[in-house]
């Protein structure tokens, strides 16, 4: 398959774009770090998890495999994956600390949250490792990251809809995660990683389209639910006012 005109131009001027890629790498690192600390802040503020179990555990599993088992596949991030793995280990501790508030109706899960999060993380790590063995670390790093990004985009939508509440949700968190994700894709393109299928690949186009749709759907869901919460709060205030007058 012939390479696209855009890809050919990028490869031709790769050296000139190296500084751009380096700047984007730093910017992406800042965005993802802000995303993780925003998770901590939101979870501590609302006392419930700010992210779902599957996105979080899959991220940690992917980061562990490509930070310590296949570090060469993530070498273009210059140690960033290891930093994110360590930060995620802090995040998951605070998430589990507040997760019991969501499981009052299921005591068995509530009593075994550390085991649950641990076994799911190990399961995803084994899956990521198996996939890397199957297709190679370079391609595994890319498509394993695709799964991370897809779950990171889908999970918050499922979470906010199932809760029917904006508690534990944050528009800032989603904004920096979305921005960081697409900076990451741009870096892959500029660095010309040989394993990357990039924009001429139907699968890559599907991934970009899917995550864009999901990321633009989230603020709509947030706005609709938040507006309903404000309406309900206003109704409760009026009821209290009437009750006070009647008394």
Swiss-Prot record:
Keyword Heme: no
Transmembrane segments annotated in the record for this chain: 20-40, 51-71, 76-96, 112-132, 141-161, 179-199, 205-225
Pfam families: Pyr4-TMTC (PF25129)
Membrane topology: Multi-pass membrane protein
Localization (cell): Membrane
Keyword Glycoprotein part of the UniProt annotation: yes
GO molecular function (one): lyase activity
Family indicated by similarity: Belongs to the paxB family.
Protein name: Terpene cyclase adrI
Lineage: Eukaryota, Fungi, Dikarya, Ascomycota, Pezizomycotina
Gene from which the chain derives: adrI
């Amino acid at each position: 398959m012939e390479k696209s005109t855009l890809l050919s131009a990028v490869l031709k001027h790769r050296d000139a774009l190296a500084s751009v890629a380096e700047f984007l790498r730093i910017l992406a690192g800042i965005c993802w770090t802000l995303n993780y600390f925003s998770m901590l802040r939101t979870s501590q503020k609302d006392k419930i998890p700010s992210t779902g179990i599957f996105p979080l555990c899959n991220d940690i599993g992917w980061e562990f495999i490509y930070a310590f088992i296949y570090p060469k596949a993530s070498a273009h991030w210059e140690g960033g994956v290891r930093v994110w793995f360590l930060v995620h280990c802090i995040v998951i501790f605070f998430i589990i600390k507040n997760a019991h508030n969501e499981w009052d109706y299921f005591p068995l899960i509530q009593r075994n949250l550390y085991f649950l999060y641990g076994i799911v993380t190990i399961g995803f790590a084994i899956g990521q490792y198996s996939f890397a063995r199957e297709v190679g670390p370079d391609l595994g790093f890319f498509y394993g990251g695709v799964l991370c990004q897809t779950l990171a985009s889908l999970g918050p939508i499922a979470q906010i809809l199932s809760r029917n509440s904006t508690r534990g949700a944050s528009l800032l968190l989603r904004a920096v995660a979305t921005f960081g994700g697409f900076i990451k894709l741009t870096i892959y393109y500029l660095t010309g990683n040989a394993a990357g299928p990039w924009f001429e690949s139907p699968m890559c186009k599907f991934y970009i389209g899917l995550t864009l749709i999901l990321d633009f759907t989230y603020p709509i869901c947030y706005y609709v639910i938040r507006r309903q919460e404000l309406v309900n709060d206003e109704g409760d205030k009026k009821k209290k006012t009437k009750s006070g007058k009647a008394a």
